[in-house]
UniProtKB/Swiss-Prot annotation:
GO function terms (MF aspect): protein-containing complex stabilizing activity
Recorded phenotype for the gene knockout or disruption: Mice lacking Atpaf1 are viable. Though it is not essential for embryonic development, its deficiency leads to growth retardation and lactatemia respectively in young and adult mice.
Gene, per the UniProt record: Atpaf1
Top-level taxonomy: Eukaryota, Metazoa, Chordata, Craniata, Vertebrata
Lipid bilayer topology: Peripheral membrane protein
Compartment(s) of residence: Mitochondrion inner membrane
Annotated GO CC locations: mitochondrial inner membrane; mitochondrion
InterPro entries with a match to the protein in the record: ATP11 (IPR010591)
Name of the protein: ATP synthase mitochondrial F1 complex assembly factor 1
Tissue: Widely expressed but with low level.
Length: 324
């Protein structure tokens, strides 16, 4: 039984030319390329722009100007403004870190401090108060009648799960025990990774962080500008309650529809299996490099694997249709 991530509601060419725009986005020029409502519980939020009432910029203002030029800037403007007003020193510090990154060769990243930040962020996850949005401590029994399926086969449970969520605006999957065990074991040693989401103007990077059987995602720009206050924009919930008896793990998701639609969330969710469940050492090697040798990590390797897998093809087609 293969695990296929579904959403209710061919290999692609490798990258030919890249222009580094900012730490969270790479615009790529190449030949033509081929999840659920969020409950605000563990929702964190994000990033700013020049405007009246804001603290003065640096000497040349280049850091702020570059940030405003970010294609995704408008999406995070209010949160960035909030950070700039409430803690100007922290805001300037984050701009300086971005400037340091820009001095590195395109495709390379100095991630040591970033990994440390993500580890601290994970420790803080369980301490955050429940708020509107994501569901805290979500269990299988909260979304599914476990008693009803005790006498069902794995295939019957799979059909029930798929039928139930196919009518909902969400991402869901039924993962075979062997595949989940592989993902889970690898997540214990490599709990953090980076996914690339195709956008009209390039790719936006999302950071994934395991906390228990939940996998939280947030845009890289959020972490750069908000640090520990960065909010989860997508959470994948894995339910292992039936793993030993039925040989399957059920998965569903919640997302912040302000930032992600279902097709985008599905693209991110599929990359979990692409990088964590692969039998190709070079692909999982990217995850290991990100966690253990961050200074050697290349952002563009993630994009290259995503393109070769074809996982972003549907999203690209939808974006191209929107253009017309």
């Amino acid at each position: 039984m293969a695990a296929v991530v579904s959403a209710a509601g061919g290999a692609c060419p490798a990258v030919l030319q890249v222009a580094g725009l900012y730490r969270g986005l790479c615009a790529v020029r190449s030949r033509a390329l081929g999840l659920g409502f969020v409950s605000p519980a563990q929702l964190r939020v994000f990033p700013v722009r020049r405007g009246s009432g804001l603290p003065p910029e640096g000497a040349d203002g280049s850091g702020v100007s570059e940030l405003e030029a970010n294609p995704f800037y408008d999406r995070y403007r209010d949160k960035i403004q909030q950070l700039r007003r409430s803690d100007p020193a922290a805001f300037e510090s984050r701009l300086e870190k971005r400037s340091e990154f820009r001095k590195q060769p395109v495709g390379h990243s100095k991630q040591s401090d970033f990994i440390k930040c993500m580890e601290q962020k994970t420790d803080a996850l369980g301490k955050q108060p429940v708020s509107k949005g994501f569901t805290k401590d979500k269990t299988l029994s909260s979304v599914f009648n476990v008693e009803m399926v005790k006498d069902k086969t794995a295939e019957e449970i799979k059909q029930i799960w798929q039928q139930y969520f196919s009518a909902k605006d969400t991402v869901y999957a039924v993962i075979p025990k062997e595949k989940f065990d592989l993902i889970w074991n690898r997540a214990q040693s490599c709990p953090t990774f980076l996914c690339a989401l195709p956008r009209r103007d390039g790719y936006e990077f999302f950071v994934g962080q395991w906390t228990g059987t939940e996998l939280h995602f947030t845009a890289l720009i959020n972490i750069q500008t908000r640090g520990d206050a960065a909010a989860s924009q997508l959470i994948l919930y894995h339910y292992p309650e039936l793993k030993e008896e039925k040989g399957i793990v059920l998965m569903t998701a919640e997302m912040d529809s302000t930032f992600l639609n279902v097709v985008e969330a599905q693209c991110i969710a599929n990359q979990v299996q692409l990088f964590y469940a692969t039998d190709r050492k070079e692909i999982y090697g990217l995850v290991e490099t990100f966690n253990f040798r961050p200074n050697e990590f290349k952002y563009m390797s993630v994009i290259a694997e995503l393109e070769q897998s074809g996982l972003g093809a549907e999203l690209k087609r939808a974006q191209n249709q929107d253009k017309t």
